[in-house]
A protein has these predicted regions:
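Local sequence-structure signature of Cys/Sec-based thiol-disulfide redox active-site neighborhoods
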Residues: 1-19
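Short, ordered loop/turn segments at secondary-structure junctions
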Residues: 8, 38, 58
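Residue-level recognition of oxygen-bearing side chains
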Residues: 15, 41, 70
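Conserved helix-turn-beta segment immediately C-terminal to the redox Cys motif
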Residues: 17-32
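Thiol-based oxidoreductase modules, predominantly thioredoxin-like and allied folds used
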Residues: 30-41
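Structural micro-motif
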Residues: 46-54
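Non-catalytic, surface beta->alpha helical segment in thiol-disulfide oxidoreductase systems
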Residues: 55-82
Length: 83
């Protein structure tokens, strides 16, 4: 599973990255987390407000910081959809 945190490196973006790390650990689903700071790539996802969270190419949150349990649910839902 591929998870991307979209944003220019602001405090909220860093916090979302930390929440995503905790959510991956909590969910037990193998995943890689990548920070995307390039404005062109962020724009390619249609994100108007950062931070953004992308799971397997799908934008699941934008302009807010979902907490660890919510992200863990997003991860397990995406993993179940792959099966």
């Amino acid at each position: 599973m591929e998870i991307k945190v979209l944003g220019p490196g602001c405090a909220n973006c860093k916090r979302l990255y930390q929440e995503a790390e905790r959510a991956v650990a909590q969910s037990g689903v193998p995943a890689t987390i990548t920070k995307v700071e390039a404005i062109e790539e962020i724009a390619s996802y249609g994100i108007l407000r950062t931070p953004g969270l992308v799971i397997d190419g799908k934008v699941v949150a934008s302009g807010r910081i979902p907490l660890t349990p919510e992200i863990a649910t997003m991860i397990t839902t995406a993993a179940a959809a792959k099966v």
